[in-house]
Amino acid sequence: MISEINGANLAYLGDAVLELLVRKKLVLSGGKLGDINKIADAYVRAGAQSKAADKLASVLTDEETAVYKRGKNVHHNSIPKNATEKEYKKATGLEALFGYLYLKGDTERIEELLDIAFPGNDTP
């Protein structure tokens, strides 16, 4: 069933998963809400997600790479002004991967990939 979900829908879900996990990470690290919100926005921008996808490329399984590519190849009618088309496609692939892993219930792998993509308290 999960393997039949298209890349756009996986990315839609993965966007929410990434947003929640980034917020969780930042809240647990402490800080003022206004600061946390600005940092969270930086993490979930297409440019930061594109860089995160590059960091993860060498550690993805074949299955994960296939899901990432399925998301990356989704057709977009518009690209945000703050990202290039290439960045946006990579970000969509990353979101699709996180959506897929969430549906599989593989929270351990999600956390592992998040730690590699966004190590420590580094901001993108």
Regions found by a protein language model. Give the residues of each.
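Double-stranded RNA-binding/processing signature
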Residues: 1-124
